[in-house]
Amino acid sequence: MEFLDIFNEGKQYRKEFYSLYQEAFPEAEKKPEALMEALTAQGKMEMLAIAEEERFIGLVINMLAKKAALLDYFAISPDIRSGGYGGRAIQKLLERFQGQKYIFEIEMQDETAPNAEDRRRRKKFYLRNGLKETGILANVYQTDFELLTPDGELTYEEYTDTLRAVLGEEGVRVLAPSLIREK
């Protein structure tokens, strides 16, 4: 399994990458492709195809700051989900960012949400694959998130500093992050 930049060595997967991005994430949570491409050109984001044996498996989009990285989007192709690819990809990502702060945003658990079961399943998946709760809940772009890291250590300030380093003050203003709870 390898991660390939869709603008360089992974350009043959670009069409599948964007197709999965459009399909896998709610409209309200998607960033404009032009913004992500601009951030990638600036070295503040990476857009990676997950491939194995020359087959497209999924996508990873990371925000990159000097002191931390943030997993912005992660998806496995629907036709191969539950095949162990997601867990293997997460393990490789954790190895890749070992020794660096690596932040994961997951939708906050909410039994009344229409996708409550999906949220439960996603959280179990991430915890099973080595992530830990930080105790931080934040509202970002009108969505409630729980923040996870490999070591369970994070402050809300580190989180917002990471967003600011990647998106700038204007981007943070648009996202309008607010703290719901910190441990």
Residue map of PLM features:
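Short amphipathic alpha-helix that is part of the acyltransferase structural core
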Residues: M1-P32, E146, D151-A165, V172-E182
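Active-site rim helix/loop that mediates acceptor-substrate recognition in acyltransferases
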Residues: Q22-E52
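Short hydrophobic/aromatic beta-strand element in the GNAT-like acyltransferase core
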Residues: M45-A49, L59, F145-L147
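Conserved beta-strand in the GNAT
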Residues: A49, R55-M63, L70-A75
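Conserved acetyl-CoA binding element of GNAT-fold acetyltransferases
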Residues: K67-P78, E105-E107
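Conserved acetyl-CoA-binding loop-helix of GNAT-fold acetyltransferases
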Residues: I76, S82-R96
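Conserved GNAT acetyl-CoA-binding A-motif
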Residues: F97-D118
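Conserved catalytic-core motifs of GNAT/GCN5-like acyltransferases
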Residues: P114-A116, R121-F145
